[in-house]
Amino acid sequence: MKNSAAIFLTSSLILLLQTLHGVKAGFICVGSSFPTNSSYQKNRDSLFSTLSDKVTTNGGFYNASLDGVHVVGLCRRDYDRQGCINCVEESIRQIKTSCSNRVQSFHCNSDDRERVSCLVRTTDQSTYRILELGPATNDPSPVAIDTFAKNMTLFRQEWEAMVDRTLEAVTIDNSTTVLKYYGALKSEFSEFPNVYMMMQCTPDINSGACKRCLQASVTYFRDQNWGRQGGGICRPSCVFRWEFYPFYGAFANVTRVPAPPRALIPRTEAISITRLKGGIIAIFVVPIVINLLVFIGLIRAYTRIRKSYNGINEAQYDYGGQSKLRFDFRMILTATDDFSFENKIGQGGFGSVYKGKLPGGEEIAVKRLTRGSGQGEIEFRNEVLLLTRLQHRNLVKLLGFCNEGDEEILVYEFVPNSSLDHFIFDEEKRLLLTWDMRARIIEGVARGLVYLHEDSQLRIIHRDLKASNILLDAYMNPKVADFGMARLFNMDQTRAVTRKVVGTFGYMAPEYVRNRTFSVKTDVYSFGVVLLEMITGRSNKNYFEALGLPAYAWKCWVAGEAASIIDHVLSRSRSNEIMRFIHIGLLCVQENVSKRPTMSLVIQWLGSETIAIPLPTVAGFTNASYQAEHEAGTLSLNELSITELSPR
């Protein structure tokens, strides 16, 4: 009776709080601004004029483009037609009011009273069939769970089980409707109020991407909002929300799902049975596993010996089945005018880079690796095996390769504006980089890293992210390049140890320099250095004799003088936004690896000015040993990957 009364009172309180939490709307404006009455605004408004009608007539989702303007609209499945129209038009009105002249905008409109939810996004880059985790809106309930706080452990277990069931319902949905990735479940918990949970993804992405998007939202809620009475997180690719009351009218015809039954075996008995079974299994399994590991070790040792003795026939090596991307050497000679000096656009640690033109007129960039360079062979193979399997607008595209005789050549898309370092560290060219342009470059690099770490079919650690390895296309969009030092991780692998440190000192994380361990957080550190360079307009090399840029920025932050490091050419009217980016950069370059954020979390922070972010702790290499480590690093520059491009 006491439990029933508590549940009734809690449910009543929740219903009273709906008026506080029922209307949920959030908008985010990012990127550069466009002039009033510009062609961009006219094209955007033209798409807006028909968007609500297009969404409803196309089954609840619509993606449209017009001369560089891209618009996406999504409504909840089983939507009411007029409700969807009203929701989309309200989102458009909010964007025009709050993000009137911003190139990129995102509005998530959720109104319980109108029984509808929708999202609208505008951008200058196509996002069709691309998983987009940011920008994101976060809307937790303002009310904390305290009525049954003593049972929070049990509640969390049942809540997690419900998340798993909803995820499964969403990602294996075989619906023939446009809005195929959708799930709304009601779960009746034995000791708590009913829980209502809804998940939805845009239908243009695949089920794996849908699952990753929703898992990211669940993880964020669990890490940042746990203890709140419900809430929602809205991303361009997915929506997640749960409450103690029905919302959107999404649960009228939903089958109730009972909570999984609790174990009937007493805990002590269950443990003893488990231990007994485990002991029996171990007796038989352990010897088998040991013998298997020994056998695998012998096979691997034999393979290494055989390779070192016989060598590798590069002419017959198909590079992971990518032989179809093989270029004829004579074609490359013609394209580059026999590697003429006039076509040379850069010189790297392992070869030269040339501009070329294919017979069809397509411009290409050709990297000709230095003959006899052992490290160059590793770089060559790495790039072929990795880049041919990666596709993202913020990664440089590998068109093909050539390995005839002693030649090892990589052919890339041509990126006309060279690399970032030729702009940000040049006194004159730096003036061209407005804050909006710098912010867009930073966000683009972050998206490229999220793809490498989380969203591609592989998990890749770049290990050599720096300004000279970020190329800029004709529209100054960034493309991460040079994957010669990259390492492939298993999806469940978190860290690795290398025998030799490779990379560029100043961008390498402390744990990598000191202990030779690396992980996704190693790339996060490098990203933080690049971000701080973008804000200051100065290379980390300029700080070598003193502290290093991360440590210098940290000391200024602690002293309350962080604004002093901002590039003087940037507008002071944007100082609040720039200070937030400095804050994020310092979080990325923290000495403590575990405190550095993931790149997906960085994307969320960059895309929203309302999400609270933690205070940074001490930056890497802040202690007195920095100078000694720098001197040790300069002794091994021959082992580092250093590529410098010069425009012609």
From Swiss-Prot:
<dbReference type="GO" id="GO:0016020">
    <property type="term" value="C:membrane"/>
</dbReference>
<feature type="glycosylation site" description="N-linked (GlcNAc...) asparagine">
    <location>
        <position position="174"/>
    </location>
</feature>
<feature type="topological domain" description="Cytoplasmic">
    <location>
        <begin position="300"/>
        <end position="648"/>
    </location>
</feature>
<feature type="topological domain" description="Extracellular">
    <location>
        <begin position="26"/>
        <end position="278"/>
    </location>
</feature>
<keyword id="KW-0808">Transferase</keyword>
<keyword id="KW-0732">Signal</keyword>
<dbReference type="InterPro" id="IPR000719">
    <property type="entry name" value="Prot_kinase_dom"/>
</dbReference>
<keyword id="KW-0677">Repeat</keyword>
<dbReference type="InterPro" id="IPR008271">
    <property type="entry name" value="Ser/Thr_kinase_AS"/>
</dbReference>
<feature type="domain" description="Gnk2-homologous 2">
    <location>
        <begin position="140"/>
        <end position="247"/>
    </location>
</feature>
<feature type="active site" description="Proton acceptor">
    <location>
        <position position="464"/>
    </location>
</feature>
<feature type="glycosylation site" description="N-linked (GlcNAc...) asparagine">
    <location>
        <position position="151"/>
    </location>
</feature>
<feature type="transmembrane region" description="Helical">
    <location>
        <begin position="279"/>
        <end position="299"/>
    </location>
</feature>
<dbReference type="InterPro" id="IPR017441">
    <property type="entry name" value="Protein_kinase_ATP_BS"/>
</dbReference>
<keyword id="KW-0418">Kinase</keyword>
<feature type="modified residue" description="Phosphoserine">
    <location>
        <position position="468"/>
    </location>
</feature>
<dbReference type="InterPro" id="IPR038408">
    <property type="entry name" value="GNK2_sf"/>
</dbReference>
<feature type="modified residue" description="Phosphothreonine">
    <location>
        <position position="504"/>
    </location>
</feature>
<feature type="modified residue" description="Phosphotyrosine">
    <location>
        <position position="512"/>
    </location>
</feature>
<keyword id="KW-0472">Membrane</keyword>
<feature type="binding site">
    <location>
        <begin position="345"/>
        <end position="353"/>
    </location>
    <ligand>
        <name>ATP</name>
    </ligand>
</feature>
<dbReference type="Pfam" id="PF01657">
    <property type="entry name" value="Stress-antifung"/>
</dbReference>
<keyword id="KW-0067">ATP-binding</keyword>
<dbReference type="Pfam" id="PF00069">
    <property type="entry name" value="Pkinase"/>
</dbReference>
<feature type="glycosylation site" description="N-linked (GlcNAc...) asparagine">
    <location>
        <position position="253"/>
    </location>
</feature>
<keyword id="KW-0325">Glycoprotein</keyword>
<dbReference type="GO" id="GO:0005524">
    <property type="term" value="F:ATP binding"/>
</dbReference>
<keyword id="KW-0812">Transmembrane</keyword>
<feature type="domain" description="Protein kinase">
    <location>
        <begin position="339"/>
        <end position="611"/>
    </location>
</feature>
<feature type="modified residue" description="Phosphotyrosine">
    <location>
        <position position="412"/>
    </location>
</feature>
<comment type="similarity">
    <text>Belongs to the protein kinase superfamily. Ser/Thr protein kinase family. CRK subfamily.</text>
</comment>
<feature type="domain" description="Gnk2-homologous 1">
    <location>
        <begin position="26"/>
        <end position="127"/>
    </location>
</feature>
<dbReference type="InterPro" id="IPR011009">
    <property type="entry name" value="Kinase-like_dom_sf"/>
</dbReference>
<keyword id="KW-0723">Serine/threonine-protein kinase</keyword>
<keyword id="KW-0597">Phosphoprotein</keyword>
<dbReference type="GO" id="GO:0004674">
    <property type="term" value="F:protein serine/threonine kinase activity"/>
</dbReference>
<protein>
    <recommendedName>
        <fullName>Cysteine-rich receptor-like protein kinase 38</fullName>
        <ecNumber>2.7.11.-</ecNumber>
    </recommendedName>
</protein>
<feature type="glycosylation site" description="N-linked (GlcNAc...) asparagine">
    <location>
        <position position="63"/>
    </location>
</feature>
<feature type="signal peptide">
    <location>
        <begin position="1"/>
        <end position="25"/>
    </location>
</feature>
<feature type="binding site">
    <location>
        <position position="367"/>
    </location>
    <ligand>
        <name>ATP</name>
    </ligand>
</feature>
<keyword id="KW-0675">Receptor</keyword>
<keyword id="KW-0547">Nucleotide-binding</keyword>
